[in-house]
Each structure stands twice: as structure tokens, then as C-alpha cells.
């Protein structure tokens, strides 16, 4: 039943994608971030939903008469330079077959990100993109938070199988990166209940991070929380809320969770931690011997025999930094970090341009929350091989699109606001009864 439903949804979306290519970018984001096809039990698990959506979106973009503009901001230019560099390293990869397979996957992500930047034209398009990302990951945060509460935190969490976020650690990283985006959605929510819903999902997502039993997520969550407080408008209120809620959540967790977190102090006795250190040493050795790095898919047992400090202990990179270092060398790591630095500066530039204009308050909040999202990803990612995960690149796209539609190439926004039709009618009815003339008129019995 789920398989048929997903197929119907995908087919029904094609006319909308052909009419407005941005709808294709949003549909692609849903399938790449939420992975609904991985929650099915039949043909949908292997059906090429993503490929079909991507092809239709590309065709719609080429055929559409809408203006399509990719602003060559520092973030976009740096992304293109990084694409060139990782392609060059793939040519000289130590594991050619695996390298080109992974190169193909990464290039699809980069292409869709650039395509998304091109087809997002208006303020409502940016809001729709942000809302799509939040709903796609908020599903897992909402579900995981309720599961953690229902089980008292005794059972861990898992994401959709066969995806970037299939295990507890990678799922927790995605949740940490998405929480600030949920706060951003709350800043432009059209009604009070939608704002409360966004905050509620953010709280449940934070609970799911704690319930993931991920030690890297604990550190990433701490960094994200600190910057969330620093970027908040009311630091006193936000700080008081954090000081009240966080200790209660930690105290409510079972002893097994506490033991897991305390193992950070005894990393010398933790085989997993020592294996990660060995893989980091492997990445450094590869980068020292090969200026281009080892190319994609370098972390293999065979290549470990040559470059690892302890060739008998094989682990994957377990760090976005050492993953990029080992696969693309010191230059690749520099380009990767520079891209996120430019993204941070883009956020600061948006905040500065928005100033105190109340019309742009939501945009300033969104830019700040994207910065917090980057901090969460860069901190939690220090312990996970998630350098090519889609979500952080969508955060970069949101920042670029936000600057584009507000300051670089603003377009008249004729698209309807993000509001469900029946909710719009009810709101209009409430507003009508609030008017003096309506209040004075007698109601019909």
C-alpha cells in the first residue's frame, strides 16, 4: 500500500514540476532527505523515484520560460572549485572502481544543489525549500522523540536502511543539523499553532538526539546549543529555558546512557575510539604521501595495509575532516573548509543587510539559524564520515537562495503564501469576527 501511495504521489507531482521546476527541487529534497521509499516493503524500495524526479526537473528547467539564475557568490564559486578538485583526485584514485561510483553519487548531489539554486526565484520559494527540508527530517525527529519518551530512552534509534542516516550516529547528526532550521521555520510561521508546532518538533528532535546514544551527537548538540543561545534574540529567556530543560532530559535518561557518554573520558580503553584514531592516522599518511589524496573510496582494508599505523585494524574515516583529507589531500580539505567559511560569511552578510527592517526579520533569523546548523554539522561531523551528506549542502543552498531573492536578483512574488487552504478560510473567518462592524452585528440563529 505504501509503495502504491508513493508512486501515485510521484506521478501526480510531475505536472506541477513541468509547470514550475522548483517543485521538482522540493520533491527531490523529500526523497533524498526523508527517504520515504526506504520505509516500504515492496517494489518502491528499489524503484528509481529520485532519478525520475531529477530527469523531469532537468527537462522542466530547460523548457521553462522562468528566469533561471545561479549567482556566482563565493559559496557557489567555491563549490564549483571543490567539484573540479574532487574530479581531479578521482582520476588518480587508489581505488578507481569505488572512486568513480562514489564520484557519481556526489556529483548528483552537487548538480541538484546547483539546480535548486537556479530554480528558486522568490521569497516563497526559499520558504518552501526550508520548510521541505524541515518536514523531511522533522518526520524522523518527531518519530524518534516520541519513541525515546515512550521507551524511557532504553532503546536506541535507527534511520531508514540503506541511506546516509541509517544508524544512530548519522541520524543524530542529521537531527542536530536540522534543529536550527526548525527554529527558522517558526520565525515565519503564518499562525501561532504552526509556530508552536515547529518549536514542538524541534524539542522532540532534540530528545531524539539524546536518545540516539551517540557520543559525537552529544558534543555536536552542546556546540549547537551554545550557538543557538548566542544567535537568539532573547538570550535571557533562551538561556533560562536551556538551563531548565536540558538537565531534566539528561537526568531522565537510563544508566546505560550515562555509561555510554562517560566512555568518552576513557577513550584509550575503547576499541571504537582507538580504531578511529588509527583511521585518522591513515588519512594523514595518505595525504602526506599523495598531494592529491587517495581519491574517493580510499578507506578500504587493502589500502589500509599500506598507509595505516596499524594495518590490522580497519575503520572508515569517522570524521568529515579526515575523510576529505584522506580522499582529496590537504588542498581538498582547505577547499572544503573554505566553502563553509564563505557560507558563514554569507549568513553574516544577510543579517547585516537585513538590519532592523521588520519585513526582513525572518530572513535574518533564517541566516543566523543556518549558521548554527553549520556549527552543529561541523562539530558532530568531526566523528562521522558524512562529508558528502545532502543536508549541509542544502543549508548552503538556502543561504545562497536567500541572498539571491532578497538582494541579488529579487523577483516579484506572485506565488501564494505557505498556508493550507482550509486554515486560510478559518483564519479569515476569525479575523472577520474581530472587526468592529462584525462584532456589532447580531449573529443568525
Model-derived regions: residue spans:
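Long extracytoplasmic/lumenal interhelical loops at the membrane interface
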Residues: 157-163, 265-328, 349-364, 369
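Membrane helix-loop boundary segments at the extracytoplasmic
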Residues: 30-40, 325-328, 361-403
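Alpha-helical transmembrane segments of multi-pass inner-membrane proteins
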Residues: 8-17, 57, 80-91, 108-115, ...
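Hydrophobic transmembrane alpha-helices and their immediate junctions
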Residues: 237, 328-374, 398-399, 404
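Transmembrane signal-anchor hairpin modules in multi-pass inner-membrane enzymes, especially those
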Residues: 1-88, 97, 101, 121-131, ...
Amino acid at each position: 500500500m505504501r509503495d502504491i501511495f508513493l508512486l501515485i504521489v510521484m506521478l501526480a507531482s510531475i505536472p506541477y514540476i513541468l509547470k514550475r521546476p522548483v517543485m521538482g527541487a522540493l520533491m527531490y529534497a523529500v526523497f533524498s532527505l526523508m527517504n520515504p521509499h526506504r520505509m516500504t516493503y515492496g517494489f518502491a524500495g528499489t524503484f528509481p523515484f529520485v532519478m525520475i524526479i531529477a530527469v523531469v526537473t532537468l527537462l522542466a528547467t530547460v523548457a521553462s520560460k522562468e528566469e533561471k539564475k545561479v549567482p556566482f557568490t563565493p559559496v557557489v564559486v567555491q563549490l564549483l572549485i571543490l567539484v573540479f578538485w574532487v574530479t581531479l583526485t578521482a582520476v588518480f584514485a587508489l581505488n578507481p572502481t569505488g572512486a568513480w561510483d562514489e564520484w557519481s553519487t556526489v556529483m548528483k548531489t552537487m548538480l541538484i544543489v546547483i539546480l535548486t539554486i537556479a530554480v528558486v526565484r522568490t521569497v516563497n520559494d526559499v520558504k518552501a525549500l526550508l520548510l521541505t527540508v524541515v518536514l523531511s527530517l522533522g518526520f524522523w525527529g518527531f518519530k524518534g522523540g516520541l519513541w525515546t519518551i515512550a521507551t524511557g530512552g532504553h532503546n536506541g534509534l535507527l534511520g531508514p536502511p540503506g541511506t546516509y542516516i541509517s544508524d544512530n550516529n548519522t541520524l543524530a547528526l542529521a537531527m542536530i543539523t536540522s534543529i536550527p532550521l526548525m527554529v527558522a521555520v517558526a520565525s515565519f510561521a503564518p499562525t501561532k499553532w504552526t509556530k508552536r508546532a515547529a518549536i514542538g518538533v524541534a524539542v522532540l528532535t532534540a530528545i531524539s538526539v539524546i536518545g540516539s546514544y551517540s557520543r559525537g551527537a552529544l558534543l555536536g548538540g552542546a556546540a549547537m546549543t551554545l550557538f543557538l543561545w548566542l544567535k537568539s534574540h532573547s538570550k535571557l529567556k533562551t538561556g533560562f529555558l536551556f538551563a531548565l530543560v536540558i538537565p531534566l532530559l539528561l537526568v531522565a535518561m537510563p544508566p546505560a546512557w550515562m555509561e555510554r557518554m562517560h566512555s568518552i573520558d576513557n577513550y584509550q580503553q575503547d576499541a571504537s575510539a582507538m580504531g578511529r584514531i588509527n583511521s585518522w592516522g591513515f588519512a594523514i599518511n595518505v595525504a602526506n604521501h599523495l598531494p592529491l589524496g587517495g581519491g574517493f573510496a580510499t578507506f578500504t582494508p587493502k589500502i589500509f595495509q599500506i598507509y595505516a599505523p596499524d594495518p590490522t585494524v580497519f575503520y572508515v574515516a569517522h570524521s568529515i575532516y579526515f575523510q576529505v583529507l584522506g580522499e582529496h589531500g590537504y588542498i581538498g580539505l582547505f577547499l572544503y573548509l573554505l566553502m563553509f567559511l564563505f557560507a558563514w560569511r554569507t549568513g553574516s552578510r544577510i543579517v547585516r543587510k537585513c538590519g532592523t527592517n521588520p519585513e526582513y526579520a525572518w530572513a535574518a533569523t533564517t541566516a543566523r539559524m543556518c549558521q548554527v546548523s553549520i556549527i552543529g554539522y561541523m562539530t558532530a561531523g568531526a566523528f562521522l564520515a558524512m562529508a558528502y551528506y545532502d543536508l549541509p549542502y542544502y543549508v548552503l543552498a538556502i543561504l545562497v537562495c536567500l541572498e539571491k531573492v532578497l538582494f541579488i536578483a529579487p523577483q516579484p512574488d506572485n506565488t501564494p503564501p505557505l498556508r493550507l487552504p482550509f486554515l486560510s478560510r478559518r483564519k479569515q473567518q476569525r479575523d472577520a469576527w474581530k472587526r468592529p462592524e462584525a462584532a456589532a452585528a447580531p449573529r443568525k440563529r
